[in-house]
Amino acid sequence: MALAASGAISFANLRDEFSPGSNTSISFSDYYRQGSKVKAKAGNNNAVHLAAAIPTSGAIDLSDFYSTARGFQYTYTSNATNQNLSTVFGNDYAVDYPKFIVINAGITVYSTSTSTAALNIASGGAGSITITNSGNIYGMGGTAGQAGGTALLASTSATLVNNSGAN
């Protein structure tokens, strides 16, 4: 859950967001982006770093943490085909860090083949994976008398939130 957008932010808030479950003392230098608590983003990760506003060095202030969160988020704003989350998140797919997929209303993620899932949550994913679907996820339809394809294939644990109107 993102930190507040304004007002007071405490060191305990930082620890709760970026070191969940920890009761250890806080060293502010651990909270630089690309430090030990706020992971770097791999070059082949197509998602948005939810803590991109946090500096990697130099002066750091609690206000740098406004509206930041622990994790990477990829938002579908246009239709897409044959999506594999290991490709979306690149080398960060195997990193123990939260990952979020958002499919906006009116957007369709679909398959072009009955042998390929529209959205593949491939094996090897680490950290929590949450998919919030306000659009559509469709497998490829089969030919007459034949089976259709898979819409969502989960080989790694994930949470799917289907919002009202989603398919």
Predicted regions and their residues:
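Glycine-biased low-complexity/repetitive sequence motifs
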Residues: 2-167
